[in-house]
Amino acid sequence: MTDSNPQTNPNDIPSAADVPAAAEGQQEQRRGGGGRGDRGDRRGGRRGDRRNQERDSEWQERVVQIRRVSKTVKGGKKMSFRAIVVVGNERGQVGVGVGKAGDVIGAVRKGVADGKKHLVKVPLTRHNSIPTLSNGRDGAASVLIRPAAPGTGVIAGGSIRTVLELAGIKNVLAKRLGSKTPLNNARAAMVALDSLRTHKETAKERGISLEQIYS
């Protein structure tokens, strides 16, 4: 692994003669106080930082699994960590990401970034449920999800429950079929959520009226 702290280049170190000059320049800037343009740049930077913090605070992250994995290379086995992370805003957007790194923190950070790249928009009803029954499959895992009445809660387990909760679904029934692997189950749940359509979209695809859907 490479050293994260690069060595300092001797040419980059300022000489003793340059230090007083730099200090005088800083004192002149303090006396002048800077122009209005500098103040505007500072305010704009603070506003940008505040907006970025608000955007980051909208998303919730949950680690589903962390495993130590190995890769056989020419020199032997290379050990690393794999993190499965679910990212969602509890308002109809959710994603599943996988990250690998030499440490746990780096793996989780990569998993969060990967999850935000694979977001799925989920249509929610007034009772925070899903409009229709749906199923999804990934590998040997299969997941069946169906809408539920208000007050039912999230009847699911494992990584499927995490995906449904971070999507903002509060009343739903889910059934896991096949493999018990957390990653396959989470991705199967994502496939099921991605295939959901509202009643209006379903009526438009079938070429019928919305009243015929409810009848």
From Swiss-Prot:
Domain of life: Bacteria
Any one Gene Ontology molecular-function term assigned to this protein's record: structural constituent of ribosome
GO cellular component: small ribosomal subunit
UniProt keyword terms in alphabetical order: Ribonucleoprotein, Ribosomal protein, RNA-binding, rRNA-binding
Any Pfam family matching the protein: Ribosomal_S5_C
Bias-annotated ranges (Basic and acidic residues): 27-61
GO BP: any one term: translation
Domain commentary: The N-terminal domain interacts with the head of the 30S subunit; the C-terminal domain interacts with the body and contacts protein S4. The interaction surface between S4 and S5 is involved in control of translational fidelity.
Family that this chain belongs to: Belongs to the universal ribosomal protein uS5 family.
Stored NCBIfam families: rpsE_bact (TIGR01021)
Protein name per UniProt: Small ribosomal subunit protein uS5
Protein source organism: Synechococcus sp. (strain WH7803)
Gene: rpsE
